[in-house]
Amino acid sequence: MSTDKITFLLNWQPTPYHIPIFLAQTKGYFKEQGLDIAILEPTNPSDVTELIGSGKVDMGLKAMIHTLAAKARGFPVTSVASLLDEPFTGVLYLKGSGITEDFQSLKGKKIGYVGEFGKIQIDELTKHYGMKPEDYTAVRCGMNVAKYIIEGKIDAGIGIECMQQVELEEYLAKQGRPASDAKMLRIDKLACLGCCCFCTVLYICNDEFLKKNPEKVRKFLKAIKKATDYVLADPVKAWKEYIDFKPQLNNDLSYKQYQRCYAYFSSSLYNVHRDWKKVTGYGKRLAILPPDYVSNYTNEYLSWPEPEEVSDPLEAQRLMAIHQEKCRQEGTFKRLALPA
């Protein structure tokens, strides 16, 4: 007999960008939809797609590239919505480390990565820039990329601008150094992708659960949309409510990460067709997807109008970079008005 319970697995320990999920819980938005949501945290973030794909968990969060790879590896998952759209992702390093904007300056360096796909990405980039995998030392860091850079265990590592880069900036501030000494070689530019969409954070479902419980998923997403609208309308008030529930995030670092995540929150929750096409192509280029792979996403369970995609995604990325730098300097909550 079907119940109203859903198990939901985060992609990491609670972070600033998980705020819509927890507020949907604490503000009763799930309950309004007749749902009982069990929010779970992974022991190992790399296990998320396997746990959802195997049916041990109903739904969860994962980045686009991992969602694609999971289905290709036999774990039946589908993206039903977006949480964080195109956060800038790249190779992070500190000024003075001997690394420059020239990718070949990474030769002989220790480079950290989160999971196996990070290693595949770095290997593909080294090949593109005339290097070999043996020209650098790969270090698997999990979610500790910034920590390892600070401790000197690695020279550089893959991270995202609104999370690990902010962590490096906070470290620099405590050292009396400018935050701008935290640098990033953006992977979208290095790999000529035209977007940072491979790290878009998605709401994903086990396929069998989705097939049997379409209305549950629709109701879940309605609650998430209401919580997202609440966050975007009053981010300061929303944050106060979030840290009341998650006091471990009541610190300057988490608040600054939240400010930097704010512009990336998907207001519509829609999967962006162009982004999926690009990342599916990128996955085939990395040989983690077969040539005939069909993207595993749907917008069928979103019950509000789909927005038009931006006409010039490269210009949108350029404007977002300027916007995020301004946010770093001023510490404000502002959304970017992208060109139509």
UniProtKB/Swiss-Prot annotation:
Molecular function as annotated in GO: 4-amino-5-hydroxymethyl-2-methylpyrimidine phosphate synthase activity from histidine and PLP; metal ion binding
Active-site residues, record numbering mapped to chain: 66
Annotated catalysed reactions: N(6)-(pyridoxal phosphate)-L-lysyl-[4-amino-5-hydroxymethyl-2-methylpyrimidine phosphate synthase] + L-histidyl-[4-amino-5-hydroxymethyl-2-methylpyrimidine phosphate synthase] + 2 Fe(3+) + 4 H2O = L-lysyl-[4-amino-5-hydroxymethyl-2-methylpyrimidine phosphate synthase] + (2S)-2-amino-5-hydroxy-4-oxopentanoyl-[4-amino-5-hydroxymethyl-2-methylpyrimidine phosphate synthase] + 4-amino-2-methyl-5-(phosphooxymethyl)pyrimidine + 3-oxopropanoate + 2 Fe(2+) + 2 H(+)
UniProtKB keywords: Iron, Metal-binding, Pyridoxal phosphate, Thiamine biosynthesis, Transferase
Entry-annotated residues carrying N6-(pyridoxal phosphate)lysine: 62
Protein residues bound to pyridoxal 5'-phosphate: 115-118
Cofactor: Fe cation
EC number, UniProt record: 2.-.-.-
Motif mapping: CCCFC: 195-199
InterPro entries: NMT1/THI5, SsuA/THI5
Record GO biological process: thiamine biosynthetic process; thiamine diphosphate biosynthetic process
Enzyme class: transferase
Function field: Responsible for the formation of the pyrimidine heterocycle in the thiamine biosynthesis pathway. Catalyzes the formation of hydroxymethylpyrimidine phosphate (HMP-P) from histidine and pyridoxal phosphate (PLP). The protein uses PLP and the active site histidine to form HMP-P, generating an inactive enzyme. The enzyme can only undergo a single turnover, which suggests it is a suicide enzyme.
Subunit structure: Homodimer.
Name used for this protein in its record: 4-amino-5-hydroxymethyl-2-methylpyrimidine phosphate synthase THI13
Organism: Saccharomyces cerevisiae (strain ATCC 204508 / S288c)
